[in-house]
């Protein structure tokens, strides 16, 4: 009897800390369902994670790009360059690869596999590690830009106005970038939003969180949308090592703190902070009289490697044990810890999902792109976060922390966060909406492969 060949799926994640883990969680799930999975990784930002994912094959594209290219080009220009460089390399790999590839799944920001799949007549789906609201907001931004309806970036009062037919988002909440020009951003978003030729869109989100946006996405692109998240909560999810080394001693420090007393601060893997803002944040945390755990990546504050510029009073607070500073933390474990009462972050979607799934309310300080969209969702739709806007001042930082950790308002927000956590937990259990969406996704991929 002839051996039945496994269905082979090629998956292409974006080489960034905020993108890789969710794609690898999806890969683990598909592998558990009997698919043969090959991950195509970039040489840029490479870290060998193969030992964490037995049964999954890995191939590295020699893109010749480095961290210095990000610094010299800027993030936006780097992403455009990455897609340009990697398209012929992927085509060469597929042409010379011994194993036949049946299906391609690619991250929305590394869209070069879409063109390769079309040239080689391979079925494909796009994976979005972003919120569905962000996907829609990119289109809203492009439409308003094309129609000349975007307010100038210095027209503050107009930027505060609600975008027509996109309540509750203001113009200032749309996913502008701090990393390049509007013209180049439109080129990126046009490619990222080119999804109608895909056989489906996979979102790391949940129907219980974004039902209306998921429905809108399905209507807009005319293809099935699979809200399968939060993927880090699926039963088959395996731990994807961080691209940064985690300092686990912070968990021992948390054990010494009172329940729901700690404000955890992490601005993600890409966001940068000015030293003036960092000083105001530091003093605000000191003046709040709450214990704090602060993740400060080397170089993330105005490119500085040393923290010598932070005030002596802050350093003394850390020395005395009320504060703890690390270069990177095991974030999911931190957020699940009983001592953590709030999460100060940039509004990145991974941080939002991890906070929601842990029942932890947030203070959001968005910087660029989807962070503004997510922050508006958290603060005005789900009401589980505060947004801290304008110029940072230590008094405002102190007040925000105390509102969240100490005041009645924060307790009510924590209750809403707990309810949202329970809804998300239910969505990933058997018969939950995300679990069913994963099953539908598996069936759809099998059908597409078998029909070839």
From Swiss-Prot:
Keywords: Glycosyltransferase, Transferase. Pfam families: UDPGT. UDP-alpha-D-glucose binds at residues 269, 329-331, 346-354, 368-371. It is an enzyme of class 2 (transferase). GO terms for molecular function: quercetin 7-O-glucosyltransferase activity. InterPro entries: UDP_glucos_trans. Its EC number is 2.4.1.-. The keyword Transferase applies. Possesses low quercetin 7-O-glucosyltransferase activity in vitro. Belongs to the UDP-glycosyltransferase family. This is UDP-glycosyltransferase 76D1. The gene is UGT76D1.
């Amino acid at each position: 009897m002839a051996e039945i060949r496994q269905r082979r799926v090629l998956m292409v994640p974006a080489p960034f800390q905020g993108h890789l883990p969710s794609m690898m969680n999806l890969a683990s799930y598909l592998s558990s369902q009997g698919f043969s999975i090959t991950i195509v990784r970039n040489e840029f930002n490479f870290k060998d994670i193969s030992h964490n994912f037995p049964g999954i094959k890995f191939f590295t594209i020699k893109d010749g790009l480095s961290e210095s290219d990000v610094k010299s080009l800027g993030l936006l220009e780097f992403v455009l360059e990455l897609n340009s460089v990697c398209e012929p390399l992927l085509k060469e790999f597929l042409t010379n690869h011994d194993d036949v590839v049946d299906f391609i799944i690619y991250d929305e920001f590394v869209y070069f596999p879409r063109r390769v799949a079309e040239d080689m007549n391979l079925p494909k789906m796009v994976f979005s590690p972003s919120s569905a609201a962000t996907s829609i907001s990119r289109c809203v931004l492009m439409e308003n830009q094309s129609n000349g309806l975007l307010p100038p970036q210095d027209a503050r009062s107009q930027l505060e106005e609600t975008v027509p037919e996109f309540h509750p988002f203001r113009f200032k909440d749309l996913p502008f970038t701090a990393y390049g020009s509007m013209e180049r951003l439109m080129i990126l978003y046009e490619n990222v939003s080119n999804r109608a030729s895909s056989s489906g869109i996979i979102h790391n989100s949940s129907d219980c969180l974004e039902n209306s946006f998921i429905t809108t996405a399905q209507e807009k692109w005319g293809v099935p949308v699979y809200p399968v998240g939060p993927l880090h909560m699926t039963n088959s999810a395996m731990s994807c090592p961080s691209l940064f080394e985690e300092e686990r001693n912070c968990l021992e420090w948390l054990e010494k703190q009172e329940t729901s007393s700690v404000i955890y601060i992490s601005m993600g893997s890409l966001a940068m902070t000015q030293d003036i803002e960092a000083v105001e944040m530091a003093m605000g945390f000191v003046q709040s009289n709450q214990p704090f755990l602060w993740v400060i990546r080397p170089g993330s504050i105005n490119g500085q490697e040393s923290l010598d510029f932070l005030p002596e009073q802050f350093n003394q607070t850390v020395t005395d044990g009320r504060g703890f500073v690390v270069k990177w933390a095991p974030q999911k474990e931190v957020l699940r810890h009983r001592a953590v009462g709030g999460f100060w972050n940039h509004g990145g979607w991974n941080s939002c999902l991890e906070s929601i799934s842990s029942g932890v309310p947030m203070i959001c300080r968005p910087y660029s792109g989807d962070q503004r969209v997510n922050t508006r969702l958290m603060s005005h739709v789900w009401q589980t976060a505060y947004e801290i806007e304008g110029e940072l001042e230590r008094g405002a930082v102190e007040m925000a922390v105390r509102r969240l950790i100490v005041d009645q308002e924060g307790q009510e927000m924590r209750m809403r966060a707990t309810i949202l956590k329970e809804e998300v937990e239910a969505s990933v259990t058997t018969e939950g909406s995300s679990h069913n969406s994963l099953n539908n996704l598996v069936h759809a991929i099998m059908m597409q492969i078998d029909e070839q």
